[in-house]
Amino acid sequence: MSEIEPGVIFTFILGSVFLISLLSDFLFGKKDGPFESYYRSGQLKEKGTHKDGELDGLCEEYYKNGQLSEKGTYKDGEPHGPFEGYSKNGQLEWKGTYNMGEECGEWIEDGETVTYDPCPPDLEDGN
């Protein structure tokens, strides 16, 4: 590989690529734009978007077997909106909504329903 495209960061350990982060840009020294990181095997580990150095928008994390582990939305670096967590075999383990980092509304955890303070109206439908 003689050229590396702008915005692509490679991290090498003992000559092998173990993490590749694809960043669309840095804005004033902060991560800004979509990113992906990978396990040493090359399997996708996580993907999402940064805005002004913080997670913002949909973010997904994966197990080493490629199965989705967790997905949820962020706003200004805080969990904000619907989140779901899965087992290594793909079964839904938990599900709920965050309001700027705080659980709200009904959550399903290990098959049980847990109720927190109500979500604001703009989050009631999972937005």
PLM regions with names:
Residues 2-127:
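Glycine/tyrosine- and acidic-biased, solvent-exposed loop/turn segments at the edges of beta-strands
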